[in-house]
Amino acid sequence: MSDRDIRCSFCGRTQKEVKKLIAGPGVYICDECVKLAYDIIEEDEEEDVTEEFEDFVLPKPHEIKNFLDQYVIGQERAKKILSVAVYNHYKRIFMKSKITEDVEIQKSNILLIGPTGVGKTLLAETLAKFLKVPFAIADATTLTEAGYVGEDVENILLRLIQNADWDIKRAEKGIVYIDEIDKISRKSENPSITRDVSGEGVQQALLRIVEGTIANVPPQGGRKHPYQEFIQINTKDILFIAGGSFEGIEKIVEKRLDVSSIGFGAQIEPKNRKSLTQILNHIIPEDLIKFGMIPEFVGRFPVVAVLEPLSEEALLKILTEPKNALVKQYKALLSIEGVEIDFTDEALRSIVKEALEKATGARGLRAVMEELMLDLMYELPNLGIKRFTITPELVYNRGKISQELLKKLAG
């Protein structure tokens, strides 16, 4: 058979009519038919995703924020930033057909910056709950790069797959929250010559799954070895939210702002008038790089939201107002036993003050409440008391509340 007679087995074009003609056992396929076949497969995959999430209704940013408001007190700016970022992320996935072919919208992962106990994890958790997508939490401090003792980054994806009931398609549209991300900063701005097990190496390992790749996940967890089978998962549509306190980064920001503000007409605000949040709201990627995050990693988290430290008033609202407020939870638990409890305003203030001393934000509230309620939940059902008021005296005596004290206060 001459070159002139060689044709594509699918469209019939000759070798001269196409750019490439690929030969197989007794058949030929041209480059145009390869592209057409690829487009058909891609279209089918998109249809599969649409069918999998056909009941998914993308809420508007206002609706997302309204739901967050039910569980997270304060943090208005952070909630607004998150709502828009999440809306755009899922719009990019589910509305591809409405985006013109000459525009490629990249994934916008989110970085949350704020002190311990201000609601970083709760925000990510609540978003996943509202959107009804799989969710997984990872602690960056437990991760190590391949070859070192610790946890492989792929195990984060295994948790997501498990939480999606092993449905890979659902997991590929999930949310992953990585806590303590600031703890894997490298020790200096200069790239390390030696291995940095807990810093730069982990950032490099995370970078691959965060930016979008086909990851091989060991189904049993643990370290990968060459003889085991893997689950493959595409991470390009997984939303990664990273959180950290980034203690000390405000000094980097202040230094840059002070230097840049020196000049004719510059408005210099005294340092003592700037709150920590005001300073952190001026964070730029270069500040994160100076802190120890590698440039490529910073580039994969273009959306940055700063969370404010919690005031006494905010903690009081957290204690009583959200759907999952601790006071509401304990009241509901004791009501099942037929016991109605109430808290005086002074008792609530006492709980907040005790929590503030712990300097762990909303986590301090839980610690104080659990210590207070342990004895009450143990003793009250046995004492036949049907109604009980919690006072500051009980708050300050928590951990050593006796039956006699309870009877006296109930009496």
Swiss-Prot record:
GO CC annotations, alphabetized: HslUV protease complex
GO annotation (BP), single: cell division
Keywords tagged on the record: ATP-binding, Chaperone, Metal-binding, Nucleotide-binding, Zinc
Residues annotated for ATP binding in this entry: P115, T116, G117, V118, G119, K120, T121, L122
Positions with a binding annotation for Zn(2+): C8, C11, C30, C33
GO molecular function, one term: protein dimerization activity
ClpX-type ZB domain ranges (all copies): 1-49
One Pfam family this sequence matches: zf-C4_ClpX
UniProt-listed InterPro entries: AAA+_ATPase, ATP-dep_Clp_protease_ClpX, ATPase_AAA_core, Clp_ATPase_C, Clp_protease_ATP-bd_su_ClpX, ClpX_bact, P-loop_NTPase, Znf_CppX_C4
Assembly and oligomerization: Component of the ClpX-ClpP complex. Forms a hexameric ring that, in the presence of ATP, binds to fourteen ClpP subunits assembled into a disk-like structure with a central cavity, resembling the structure of eukaryotic proteasomes.
Similarity annotation: Belongs to the ClpX chaperone family.
Classification via NCBIfam families: clpX (TIGR00382), PRK05342.1 (NF003745)
Reported function: ATP-dependent specificity component of the Clp protease. It directs the protease to specific substrates. Can perform chaperone functions in the absence of ClpP.
The protein, known as: ATP-dependent Clp protease ATP-binding subunit ClpX
UniProt source species: Dictyoglomus thermophilum (strain ATCC 35947 / DSM 3960 / H-6-12)
Source lineage: Bacteria, Pseudomonadati, Dictyoglomota, Dictyoglomia, Dictyoglomales
